[in-house]
């Protein structure tokens, strides 16, 4: 089994209050918590976000610039469409297994204030390993030569 000693999450600094109060939540949970009506919420979860979105709660949801539909579509397997992939990813919280990947993401945030959250990987996986998923690729990037992705891209940590 893959051992992850330290895990990292890069959060928008404006979201720290929400994270302290509610924990790290997926985009799907953040939209529900913000009181976005279900029909609008479902549409938002399946739509590409070319820009960041600020919710009525003040929480900032990151853009999905590295996953434009035209670049993503040819990389999808299992009959998935770009809206299916966006919805799938919007149901998860993502952590990086190494600092280098985190720093690449930070550079992509183009100067917006960020906060680095550092987790004890062994403890986190002990407590949440049953629902943790791992991916062999950066599932949120479809630029350049995108890796194939499908229903088995996010794999159960226990089976990794």
Roles of regions detected by a PLM:
Residues 1-48:
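Gly/serine-rich nucleotide phosphate-binding loop at the start of the catalytic core
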Residues 1-3, 38-72, 77-93, 97-160:
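Conserved NAD+-utilizing ADP-ribose enzyme module
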